[in-house]
Regions:
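Conserved active-site-proximal phosphate/metal-binding subdomains
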Residues: 26, 36-79, 85-175
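Conserved alpha/beta-domain cores
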Residues: 1-48
């Protein structure tokens, strides 16, 4: 099991909670920065804040993983994700101490990806200005490609469907 975290604090909380409840530690940790696609584990104001960028939070998560390793005698690899695009990006992240990288968006348009051809073509046709931060159905910021559907949501003409599985929930206690 490999949870996605966005801070050293989150990594520590998950590891300690899993250990106390299940007597199990994560097999690895994915630390995802705010440049990722899809749902983001950050508030809107944190997305461009240098204190929350992958290069800043990665060392914090690595430090927590090392402390867990010392405490329990088990290495937890740290995998970096979010905004990693090129070989140079991979090199920089690995030099910061990551055990590996996770790249998702980079491979969406490949033959091996099972997304629909229409979805893939949307990626291929997109320009930088088409990428927007939206409020997802669970209340979290998300990075998405602008579309007519997104425009209708912004205008209040459409509402995203609620996920019946409740697999992602907002941490906003006011809701």
């Amino acid at each position: 099991l490999v949870p996605i975290v966005s801070s050293g604090r989150a990594a520590k909380l998950i590891c300690e909670k899993w250990k106390s409840i299940y007597n199990y530690l994560p097999d690895a940790l994915v630390v995802e920065g705010p440049k990722a696609g899809g749902h983001l584990g950050f508030k809107n104001e944190q997305i461009d804040d240098e204190h929350y960028q992958l290069e800043t939070i990665l060392p914090e998560v690595i430090q927590e993983a090392h402390e867990i390793e010392e405490k329990y005698g088990r290495k937890i690899p740290v995998i970096a994700a979010g905004g990693i695009y090129s070989g140079d990006d991979i090199r920089k992240i690995m030099e910061l101490g990551a055990d590996g990288v996770q790249m998702g968006t980079r491979f969406v348009t490949t033959e091996e990806c099972d997304a629909s051809d229409v979805f893939k073509q949307t990626y291929l046709n997109a320009h930088e200005e088409d990428i927007q931060i939206i409020r997802s159905p669970v209340g979290m910021p998300g990075r998405a490609i602008f579309s007519n559907f997104i425009q209708k949501i912004k205008e209040g003409k459409k509402q995203p469907k609620v996920c019946p599985f409740n697999c992602i929930k907002t941490c906003d206690i006011s809701k």
